[in-house]
Amino acid sequence: MALADLALSNIWGGLSSDFKKKNFSLYGQWISILTIFLCLALGVANIFHLGPIIVFSIICIVQGLIVLFVEVPFLLKICPLTDTFVNFVRKFDGNLPRCGFYLLNAVIQYLSLTLQATSLLVVAILFTISSACYALAALKHQEYLKSSLDVTGTGSGGALEAQVGEHVVRNVL
């Protein structure tokens, strides 16, 4: 129970410290993380529709997995992936590239409305909001930042990617 409380306090602490920075790229990142869960859940839920909407639900699941690798970069180091995919994901390491990436994902999901109105519309709207956050960050010339979520509980407040690297070193030694 204490471990769960520590994890929740670290998540809420990281979330609140990110929102205090008033940087739109952090807002876009948190919205994108929420979108990952919705892509997977709504993609699976819409697979059970009969007809061509199944294609968009499969695309939604794939989008959720790609966004997972874009927004949680340490997964690129711990998962066995091809260099082509890793280089593709690293192209979105900035405000404008992410704005375009999420806008493209939103357009793909908005196209599902041509077949049938489903809950995939929620994913399209969240992709649009995330794209808008990254666009605002670029327009305001805000630095591209990554979340300061502290999953280790060390209080370092460092990047999530660096924290995982520390654990890997500890486990090896």
Swiss-Prot record:
GO terms for biological process: vesicle-mediated transport. This is Golgi apparatus membrane protein TVP18. Glycans are attached at residue 23. It is found in: Golgi apparatus membrane. Belongs to the TVP18 family. The gene is TVP18. Pfam families: Cg6151-P. PANTHER family: CALCIUM CHANNEL FLOWER HOMOLOG. The chain crosses the membrane at residues 28-48, 50-70, 96-113, 119-139.
